Amino acid sequence: MLEARDISVKYGGTTVLADASLSLLPGKITAIVGANGAGKTTLIKALNGAVPISAGEILLGGKPIDSLTRSQIAREVAVVAQETESRFPVTVREFVLTGRFAYGSSFGWENAGDIDAAERAIADCELVELSGRLMNDLSGGERQRVVLARALASEGHVLLLDEPTANLDLANQTLMFRLVLERCKKQDYAAAIITHDLNLAAEFADEVVMMAKGRIVHSGKPEEILNAANIREIFNVEVLLDRNPSSGKARVTQVY
């Protein structure tokens, strides 16, 4: 479990995140939505201990995150950013194995546990046939699945995903969400995913957090949060909503 209690972040003298509280629970996916500049990425970085907080506290497994080393955090919290750092001239298998470096592994020095974790993650992300391919030769959707597999190989039980589906087509976006959902449900992982796709948030998330101007302004179940009034407030657009006929969940059908 990862919990933020009234946390704030300042850059210089400017507050970019204020009084944010949320809990990431085992087996649950939290979708974080909001316009550009709302503070979503800052929140993810704070939850990972990558940026210092100026107020409040963050607890990882009940322990203050600032009392833990970077290696201790990396063993429990895995981060997937937008498509970055994935064009190295290494194979898919080698790249996924870097997810084990927090345990003291390095290229050529992997133990059986490292290899087993990497192979499970490769299989879970449907990458077995690509495991010998070079990262440089993959499509954007394939590379993002590899980055997710690296995060899963770390076996940290908290996943933080910063717009992992940006620039992907709908099929690959849906696949990414499905893969995260499967890991959360099967192995009791907790996940927070930043996304601009409200329909994916409605379909896959257990909770939706809506942010604006560095604050969490709404949070709750998708059916409670994703309505026309809240979307107008956060994104300054008008939308039409109906129900997905297969799942019965809310979906945006028109933006104007």
Question: Which residues does each PLM region occupy?
Answer:
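The feature captures the beta-strand-to-loop junction immediately N-terminal to the Walker
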Residues: 33-35
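Helix-to-loop junction immediately C-terminal to a conserved catalytic motif
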Residues: 48
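Conserved ABC transporter NBD signature motif
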Residues: 56-64, 73
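Conserved ABC ATPase "signature" region
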Residues: 97, 112-130, 155
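Conserved ABC ATPase signature
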Residues: 108, 134-138, 142
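Catalytic Walker B motif of ABC-type/P-loop ATPase nucleotide-binding domains
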Residues: 159-163
